Amino acid sequence: MIPVFLAAIAVFLPLTSGHIAFWHNSMYGFNVTEQTFPYDNRPVVPLQNMTFKEWWFHNHLDYPPHPGDFFELPAGKPAMAELACNKGATTWFNSSEGGNIQNGDDPCPGSPPSEYHTTGFDDLKGCALAIAYEPDVTKIKPEDFTIFSVNQTCVWYRFTDFQVPERMPSCPPGGCHCAWFWIHSPDSGGEQIYMNGFKCKITGSTSNVPLAKPKVARRCGADPDHGKPDAVPGNCTYGAKQPLYWLQQEGNNEFDDYIAPPFYNDLYNFKDGAQNDIFIDSYPHGIPDPSPEQTIIPTPLDAAVISNATPAPSNGSCSSRPPSSPVSSSAASTTTSRSPRPSARGFRRSTGEKAHTGLPRKSWTQSRKMRYVF
């Protein structure tokens, strides 16, 4: 009787759909549903082979947030985001179609990790936040966004910390625009990119040094799955980098093969945490042109030295020491909580999966024969 009873209950348990989105009331498309567009364009839907209008800001520019709704980014501290398969799994459930289905730190209640495109913790490839210091969203171009924070355990936790560089300058009147980006492992589902745009502002700024002009990131890390066991540091892009625009009909800045996607991790020199070398004075001796043959590896000036020489804005100050616990950037109250943890190599949530066998993966030609044609 018990198995039958449990099976009957399971029928009524709310299951979330796959895929992931950044959820906050500052985002574009916060209330977009499956019926809003002629096609399914919910914030969680992945982006692949789309026109520029369709993938840029997820085609949600006509669905802006309310004036005054911003995602706060505390300089020198972590900003806590909520990543989930469904708005109902977040503190914003009261405006979701299915009600409250929160389950602690689970980003996709009722679904296995394959629903958010990973075979397990060791298969995570990272996600990132980018910023453009422009309040008018219609003026922003893809090359205006700069990646300022990376979390290499994304997506694994619903509550995901993004460390904000201490030297981030204040936003102009009207605020900044930010976007969340994610590209998942090729070992779990078809390839796409994810982008959710939102309005944001820097709080507690103590610097007025602007960001450098971002450049296109280059593949330079160790890539044993594709026959490159060693990193090639000379081929890396150093300093400010653009997001990875990939696999669309137009607007791409990355052209990797469908089965060798770019990632927000060491493969493209996106280190875990705050990207502290994105400012115009980060490399006072310049950055050499990257290439596989380049032997000069630039070193950014020590942030502490720069901070001592940087005048603070006159409109306020902020302690440069990060707090012992994360700062929530959500204005909504939550019934769940969790302890702070490192963004990479953190505690692993049990999934009931078998331990990694240590067997080598198949080569890309063995594992998939599909090739994406641009």
Swiss-Prot record:
Glycan attachment positions: 31, 49, 94, 151, 235, 315
The keyword Oxidoreductase is assigned to this record: yes
Start-end of Low complexity biased regions: 313-344
Main localization of the protein described in the UniProt heading: secreted
Disulfide feature: 85-108, 127-154, 171-176, 178-200, 220-236
Cofactor(s), by name: Cu(2+)
Keywords per UniProt: Copper, Disulfide bond, Glycoprotein, Metal-binding, Monooxygenase, Oxidoreductase, Secreted, Signal
Enzyme Commission numbers on file: 1.14.99.-
Subcellular location: Secreted
Name of the protein this chain belongs to: AA14 family lytic polysaccharide monooxygenase B
Organism: Pycnoporus cinnabarinus
